[in-house]
Design a protein with these regions (language model features):
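Short amphipathic alpha-helix adjacent to the substrate-entry channel of hydrolases
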Residues: 81-103
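Short conserved active-site loop signatures built around small residues
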Residues: 1-64
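A conserved short beta-strand
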Residues: 178-202, 218-219
């Protein structure tokens, strides 16, 4: 689906199956001035006042309704399109009864002159919710192929790199009635987002200075590679630690640290070199696992997570608790797990200081 006017990709121009309307992001991200923005507008043919709603969809046969999974790519060279990079797992999910959509945010990515230094993260998150608005409409419109086939009560977001930072922010915005910097900008999202997967997420943006994002009552999975040369630390651990379960429903959160995985091989559009030339020439790629094996891990863990979160198959929680139970499926290597659910009770967390 797309606006039908893309000048670089036919699948979002003449070949798109469902036409969408462009959206105005200027209240959140102004691209109207500067040489870099001028170059970008020449390349893309649009700016922040008319961002397209483009996406690739994989879906199962049958009437449904099927849970909806949105994939959000991260930052890369904008002309090397990132949204096709998750087909390997989207096709698997479609075969298991999910609608999977990989959305296009390439126009927010880097070019030869640099990137937006994470100032675009809010816009990345807001665009996720604008895509979900389209899905809500299609599910209610008889003249669309997705009429009454989407289970809008069971939605999950899967974000990679900056997409991994945008996804949890989208969950926060989803519950807000107005833009926190301008109350004249009303929001009316209120989607039923049940789960979130962060793949090697960044963590450089916060809605409040020096205050990390806090989530509650949602299922969470973090995948992080030990040989990541883009996101050097496990930035997603903040989300894990700041996610709290406060209602009476069952929720869970899990981390898988993959020693020999890098940043880019979770996407077929990126690859083994996490940093651009000439710095990439300094990388020692020998210890990395192969891309197929790394993506096999992502397929295994993300599908198990979604089955547990959106379909209530708690038997899939076993590998999220202990990677050794998946040894017959995933490549041989070093892994570390972390897991907690709403039944977990703290006896002591050693945060009491002198008041013990």
């Amino acid at each position: 689906y797309g606006n039908g006017d893309d000048k670089n990709r036919d699948e979002y121009a003449n070949s798109c199956d469902i036409k969408t309307s462009s959206v105005d992001a200027t209240p959140f991200f102004d691209q109207t001035s500067g040489f870099d923005n001028w170059i970008r507008e020449i390349f893309w043919g649009f700016g922040a006042s008319n961002y397209p709603i483009n996406g690739r969809v994989w879906y199962p046969e049958g009437q449904g309704p099927f849970p909806l999974v949105i994939f959000v790519h991260g930052n890369h060279l904008m002309q090397e399109y990132s949204d096709p990079g998750y087909e390997y797992i989207a096709t698997l999910l479609a075969s298991k009864g999910y609608i999977a959509a990989s959305i296009d945010e390439n126009f927010l990515n880097s070019n030869w002159s640099g990137d937006y230094s994470h100032n675009e993260i809010f816009t990345r998150a807001w665009l996720i919710l604008k895509h979900l608005e389209c899905w809500r409409e299609w599910n209610q419109q008889e003249d669309t192929p997705f009429y009454q086939t989407v289970d809008m009560d069971n939605i999950a977001l899967v974000g990679h790199s900056r997409g991994g930072q945008a996804a949890p922010l989208a969950i926060v915005i989803n519950k807000q009635k107005r833009y926190y910097k301008d109350a004249n900008q009303d929001f009316n999202f209120n989607f039923s987002i049940k789960g979130i997967v962060e793949i090697a997420p960044t963590a450089f943006y916060s809605m409040h200075k020096d205050k990390p994002l806090e989530l509650e009552n949602i299922d969470y999975l973090l995948l992080q590679g030990g040989y990541d040369q883009d996101v050097f630390s496990m930035a997603g651990s903040r989300k894990y630690n700041n996610l709290h379960f406060t209602d009476t429903n069952f929720h869970f959160k899990s981390v898988l640290y993959i020693y020999a995985a890098n940043h880019g091989q979770f996407s077929t559009a990126w690859g083994r070199k996490d940093i651009p030339f000439p710095y990439s020439a300094l990388l020692n790629l020998t210890p990395l696992m192969d891309g197929e094996g790394q993506r096999k891990i992502a397929q295994t863990y993300i599908s198990a997570f979604l089955d547990a979160s959106l379909k209530g198959k708690k038997e899939n929680l076993s590998i999220l608790k202990d990677y050794r139970l998946a040894k017959a499926i995933i490549p041989k290597g070093y892994y570390f797990n972390q897991y907690e659910d709403s039944g977990f009770k703290y006896i002591a967390d050693y945060e009491e200081d002198l008041d013990v």
